[in-house]
A protein has these predicted regions:
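PAPS-dependent sulfation machinery
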Residues: 31-132
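Short, charged low-complexity intrinsically disordered segments located at boundaries
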Residues: 5-11, 43-49, 143-151, 177
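PAPS-dependent sulfotransferase catalytic domain
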Residues: 106-131, 136-149, 153-229
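Glycine-rich phosphate-binding P-loop
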Residues: 2-20
Length: 229
C-alpha cells in the first residue's frame, strides 16, 4: 500500500490485513523480533514490553494517540524497519536537519530493501504466508528498488489531495518534533515536509510508468472513505 502520508494508507492497510490470506508485520514483531531465550512466555513478555513502551510514548506525546493509533498487536508499516538503516523520514519528524533531508532524497535505498527482505525472511521462521501485505508512504519514492527486490510485488496507490494530506502530516511532525527538539518552527516544518514529499511523489509518478497495469491499482481516498467495502 503506497500513497502520501495521511492519505488513508493505514485505514486501507488495516482493512486488507483482515484477509487471512495476508500477513502483515505486527508492531511488536518489528520492535522486538527475536526472543532472548526460547520458551512459551517470551512472546507474551515481548508484547507486554512493547505496550509499556507505547504507553510511555503517549505520555510524552499526548496527541499521538488520536493522530496515529498503534498497539503491540496491530499491523505496522515498514518505515520502522528502514530506521535500522538510518534512512527514514521518521528522523525528519524528530529534528530539523536540512542536510539529512537532502541526503534522504538522493541516497540509494538498495541496501535498505536488501535488509528489508532479510528481516521478513527472519519473520517467516514462524511460518510463510500466502502473501505479505506491506504499507509505507515512503515506498512511493522507491518503486524501482522494490521491484528489484520483489519482482512480483503489486501496488495499491491511494490518492488524497496533497493539500489535506501534507497539512495533516505537518501537524503530526510538529507534535513529534516538540518531544525531541527544543525549538520547533511551523514554517520550517511546512517547507521541509512539502519539499520531501513533493520529491517522493514526483519520483513515484515517473517510476510507476514502467509497471504493467496488472501490477498497480489506484484508489481515490474520498471514494474509499465513503465506501470502504
Amino acid at each position: 500500500v503506497i500513497g502520501l502520508p495521511r492519505s488513508g494508507t493505514t485505514f486501507l492497510f488495516n482493512l486488507l490485513s483482515l484477509d487471512n490470506n495476508h500477513r502483515s508485520p505486527l508492531y511488536w514483531e518489528i520492535m522486538n523480533p527475536l526472543p532472548l531465550v526460547k520458551n512459551n512466555k517470551q512472546e507474551v513478555w515481548r508484547k507486554r514490553k512493547i505496550n509499556l513502551e507505547l504507553k510511555f510514548a503517549r505520555v510524552i506525546i499526548p496527541k499521538l494517540k488520536n493522530m496515529h493509533h498503534i498497539r503491540a498487536e496491530t499491523p505496522e508499516e515498514c518505515e520502522l524497519i528502514a530506521t535500522m538503516n538510518v534512512r527514514s523520514f521518521v528522523y525528519i519528524c524528530m529534528a530539523n536537519i536540512p542536510e539529512y533531508v537532502e541526503y534522504l532524497k538522493n541516497c540509494s535505498f538498495t541496501s535498505v530493501f536488501e535488509w528489508h527482505k532479510k528481516f521478513f525472511q527472519m519473520l517467516e521462521c514462524s511460518g510463510r504466508p500466502n502473501r505479505w501485505l506491506l504499507k509505507d508512504p515512503s515506498h512511493i519514492g522507491h518503486i524501482p528498488e522494490i521491484i528489484t527486490t520483489y519482482p512480483n510485488a503489486k501496488f495499491i496507490n491511494i490518492h488524497r489531495s496533497p493539500i489535506e494530506s501534507i497539512a495533516s502530516f505537518c501537524s503530526l511532525t510538529k507534535n513529534i518534533r516538540s518531544t525531541f527538539s527544543k525549538y520547533v518552527e511551523s514554517e520550517s516544518i511546512g517547507e521541509t515536509v512539502l519539499d520531501f514529499w513533493q520529491h517522493s511523489l514526483n519520483k513515484g509518478i515517473d517510476d510507476r510508468k514502467v509497471l504493467p497495469d496488472n501490477q498497480i491499482a489506484d484508489i481515490a481516498y474520498s471514494e474509499f472513505i465513503n465506501n470502504p467495502i
